[in-house]
């Protein structure tokens, strides 16, 4: 399994181990799927900024605003062709940091969650309806728990 990380935005230096966090999260997501991951699978993760992800979001989703993560699954190749590209996950720094602050999470944990989320999208998970969302969120919770990260969907405790 090859996972390439490109850090496009220097601001990610505020989280010095961002590339390692992203790789660990993607590996955990893929490991959770076992045999569903094709032999020779590879993917890329791009750590970018809000300006770049806004352009991509506008181009590919007709939404002219930044978002936290985008996933671009690769076209399927015949079985046995190696390498098997899974696709690309792109994460926006400013949105990750602002959401983490608003949700009382660490940026590292939020980044890991978004990479897990994006990687699951590459593997065919979706959240277009309630059943799909429940299945995807359950998978995310399990994967993140294995990384020592609390349930990202839990409401903060009042107090």
UniProtKB/Swiss-Prot annotation:
Q: Its Enzyme Commission number?
A: 3.1.-.-
Query: Where is Zn(2+) bound in this sequence?
Result: 117, 121, 127
What does UniProt give as GO cellular component? cytoplasm
Q: What class of enzyme is it?
A: hydrolase
Q: Name one GO molecular function term.
A: RNA endonuclease activity
Hydrolase listed as a keyword:
yes
Q: Where in the cell is it found?
A: Cytoplasm
Keyword presence, Cytoplasm? yes
Biological-process GO terms, alphabetical: rRNA processing
Q: Which residues cross the membrane?
A: none
Q: What does this protein need as cofactor?
A: Zn(2+)
- PANTHER family, per the entry: ENDORIBONUCLEASE YBEY, CHLOROPLASTIC
Family statement drawn from the similarity comment of this UniProt entry? Belongs to the endoribonuclease YbeY family.
The protein here is known as Endoribonuclease YbeY
Taxonomy of the source species = Bacteria, Pseudomonadati, Pseudomonadota, Alphaproteobacteria, Hyphomicrobiales
Q: Which gene encodes it?
A: ybeY
